[in-house]
């Protein structure tokens, strides 16, 4: 992944990012410390937000979306979708999440929400995506795409070196 542009963010821009991350995390000041160096790295596909050279989020369609590396450190307790073990091999190759593979989902999820997909055994994040149906539908549907996969273990964002 080639970086086209990279720059440090102003305090005002950092505040905006913190506000967007507060939707998912209560510990935003730990995620982005006052003395942390916050940068944006612009690639052909994404704008990656770095704190002390560690990718914590990326921007897609004007949404700030947490990276899996951040989720491994601090997993929110909302917007979670649990998938069965059989789905993992497809998700880590970039496949969208299909409804039959979903074991459980936060019923407060609405269509177009950012969601975090975890495995049923270890509850470790596997991918981050956008909900294509609400949480209740995800649990009940037996066919169709439920989540558009945006970022998964082993992709360009996962392998990004700050």
From Swiss-Prot:
Please provide, alphabetically and separated by semicolons, the GO molecular function terms listed in this UniProt record: RNA binding
Instruction: Return the InterPro entries for the record.
Output: CHP03684, DUF1947, MCT-1/Tma20, PUA, PUA-like_sf, Uncharacterised_CHP00451
PROSITE patterns, A to Z: PUA
Which residues does the UniProt record annotate as the domain PUA?
78-154
Family annotation (Pfam families): DUF1947, PUA
Highest taxon of the source?
Archaea
- GO BP annotation list: formation of translation preinitiation complex
Q: Which PANTHER family match?
A: MALIGNANT T-CELL-AMPLIFIED SEQUENCE 1, MCT-1 PROTEIN
- Protein name per the record: Uncharacterized protein MJ1432
> Which species?
Methanocaldococcus jannaschii (strain ATCC 43067 / DSM 2661 / JAL-1 / JCM 10045 / NBRC 100440)
């Amino acid at each position: 992944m080639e970086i086209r542009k990279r720059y440090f963010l102003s305090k005002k821009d950092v505040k905006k990012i913190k506000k967007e991350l507060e939707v998912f995390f209560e510990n935003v000041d730990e995620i982005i410390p006052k003395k942390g160096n916050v940068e944006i790295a612009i690639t052909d596909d994404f704008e990656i937000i770095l704190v002390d050279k560690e990718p914590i989020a990326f921007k897609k369609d004007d949404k700030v979306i947490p990276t899996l590396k951040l989720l491994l450190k601090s997993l929110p307790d909302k917007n979670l979708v649990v998938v069965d073990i059989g789905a993992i091999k497809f998700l880590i190759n970039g496949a969208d999440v299909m409804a039959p593979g979903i074991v459980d989902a936060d019923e407060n999820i609405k269509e177009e929400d950012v969601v975090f997909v975890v495995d049923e055994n270890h509850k470790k994040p596997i991918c981050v995506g956008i909900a294509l149906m609400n949480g209740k539908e995800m649990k009940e549907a037996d066919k169709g795409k439920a989540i558009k996969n945006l970022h998964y273990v082993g992709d360009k964002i996962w392998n990004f070196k700050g």
